[in-house]
Amino acid sequence: MDFSIKACDWSKGSTNGFLTGKSDCIVIGVFESQTLSGAALEIDAATKGLLTRIIKAGDMDGKTGSTVFLHEVQGIGASRVLLVGLGKQDAFTQKVYGDAVRAAWRAILGTKVAQVTFTLVQAPVKERSSDWAVRAAILALRELTYKFTQMKSKPDTSTRALKRIVFSVDAADEKLAKVAVKQGVALANGMDLTKDLGNLPGNVCTPTYLGNTAKKLAKDWKLKVEVLGQKQIEALKMGSFLAVTQGSVEPPQFIVLQYQGGAAKAAPVVLVGKGITFDTGGISLKPGDSMDEMKYDMCGAGSVLGTLRAVAEMGLKLNVVGIIPTCENMPAGNATKPGDIVTSMKGLTIEVLNTDAEGRLILCDALTYAERFKPAAVIDIATLTGACIIALGHHNSGLFSKDDALAGELLDASKEASDPAWRLPLDDEYQDQLKSNFADIANIGGRPAGSVTAACFLSRFTEAYPWAHLDIAGTAWKSGAAKGATGRPVPLLAQFLIDRAAQ
């Protein structure tokens, strides 16, 4: 699909061919107040009051997400008009805008419309600009048109009728709207990569596959890449990481991707993604029900790859490093056992009380490795704990950080990106739950506050830099009839990096 911008100076009556230009459909928003403005006023005038008559007849009440198609409209170049309800104007929030936009796209996608002029981006969303609205509209459309069929014997190769979308914006917003198009497409491409990797089965998306994906990404976008194997990981003395992988026949990989968009000596932001390509729980075996979904335990790694792809496509002016420890967690005769004690790269000894708390074991060595980059900030992303799902459900990702400024940046980015996160506590008192009689630290702290103690464990390895942890166990994928990876938290991470690059 091709996205472009057309500027119209409504205040001066300059529509830049808006009414007469070739288009299969013009999308117009109507509030419950039924007051017409901007593009709607122009169309109403050109059609001799058609919109006014439709509204007065009660065919469009303006309620959020309601849609009405008008066919063979006289006086304009488009063959039809789609009216979309926007709800109450004084309550037109980010969420309501998203609901209205998705309703519009669903209506359009149910037709054979090939070219659309889209004016909903002009509607005044509270605390958001029209360029934000453009990007959100692109992401909504790409989300609705995403499909994963490559593992079927006959993949769906059909194409959508919709080919071209023109966003109509005020002349003053044209420059930023064009930037928003670039960002929206880049973000959607990054999310698609993240979703594709998550949706692949564990026998395809292995650690080696993730390593090869990183190499291809580096080649396509001129990134620097290193993919370390078993012997190199052993040489780095990553005993905690190796303890997780030793029960699997799949070799582990330690992936390091570097994007250089800023000054050569500028401190990078480091993203660390958990890459367990299949998690059985190891000797602490998981229940069989829904174990197939443990292919999604690499979604943290997938989000790092997707974010780096988006960052490279946007050409952001900062440096970013992606670190991905990736392996399987399998039971075997040589697998790590509950009660085993391993030594991390940092030198801390860890008593493995539960082999199904493996994500923190691979992340802690990656967080130690991150020190060599002298980072401006480190964010780890992991489908870490079921406890986070119990606490927050499937709407908010869990955010943990002792750095208030960094946490604030991430929360602001989550709101801007419509990719919500909620900050959870990281008080020192929780560390007591991780005490071990036999090692420096235990890898679990019991059932109470499970997501918090997991973050506390990771915090022991992050003292050298500002750090935040995102637990995406509840947000990285959906179950049931809509089963599939969501691409989150790529929007949050990308927005955080966009904001950092602008500083």
From Swiss-Prot:
Keywords of this entry: Aminopeptidase, Cytoplasm, Hydrolase, Manganese, Metal-binding, Protease
Record-linked SUPFAM superfamilies: Macro domain-like, Zn-dependent exopeptidases
Residues that, per the record, bind Mn(2+) 2: K274, D279, D297, E358
GO cellular component, one term: cytoplasm
Cofactor: how and how many bound: Binds 2 manganese ions per subunit.
Highest rank taxon of the organism: Bacteria
Cofactor: Mn(2+)
Listed GO biological process terms: proteolysis
Matches recorded under HAMAP family: Cytosol_peptidase_M17
Entry function: Presumably involved in the processing and regular turnover of intracellular proteins. Catalyzes the removal of unsubstituted N-terminal amino acids from various peptides.
Protein's name according to its UniProt entry: Probable cytosol aminopeptidase
Organism placement in taxonomy: Bacteria, Pseudomonadati, Pseudomonadota, Betaproteobacteria, Burkholderiales
